[in-house]
Amino acid sequence: KCIQMDRVYRAERPQKGRLREFVQCDIDIIGSDSTDSEIELILTTTKALDAIGMKNYKVKINDRRLLRAVLISFGFKEEELDSVCITFDKMDKVGLDGVKEELEGKEFDKQAIDKFVQFLSKAGTAQNIKLDSVKDMLEDKTPAESIENIIDTVNKLTGGRYEVVFDLSLVRVQGYYTGTVFEVESLD
């Protein structure tokens, strides 16, 4: 287990909400692929937020393996997934039409794009997509079951003090994110 907090820097152009320099706290559990580690990280994070007086928030969770499996089920190729994820990560900024237009501009398979866009438009927003509907699409249900276990366990252990939700749009485009990802969203 490792915890560190310090100034970090982005090697990119600063933009709204993305400062070049900022303070970041990393909490890592190295060498374990157990969902217990993910649960511990979420509980540690929320305990720290509670300690500094943050009370009204929700935890959003996804899994890169699950997202990749969903994209492959629509017909995208393995070697296209990073590029598709980069585009999908822009959805809150450019909307579904913008995502579709960018995917078409990258000349991905039209049928894969149409299936993906139809799936997203049925739900209204990517945040409205239910884990069960994603799970039903997949041959390997392990990542979806892992997220279910994490959500159920955290909810039981915290007595529902805050909401823990599946969010397919939580993308994280950096290659070093390979499994479960989560973020906390303030509701204030």
What name fits each language-model region?
Residues 1-3, 53-59, 78-82:
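Short secondary-structure capping/junction motifs at helix and strand boundaries
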Residues 2-55, 65, 99-188:
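Positively charged, Gly/Ser-enriched RNA/tRNA-binding surfaces
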Residues 59-70:
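Glycine-rich, mobile lid/loop segments that gate access to catalytic sites or pores
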Residues 60-61, 85, 167-168:
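A generic structural motif
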Residues 62, 76-79, 91-94, 108-111, ...:
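Short coil/turn linker and secondary-structure boundary residues
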Residues 68, 90, 176:
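Short Asp/Glu-rich motifs
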Residues 75-101, 186:
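Acidic, His- and aromatic-enriched active-site or binding-groove loops in soluble protein domains
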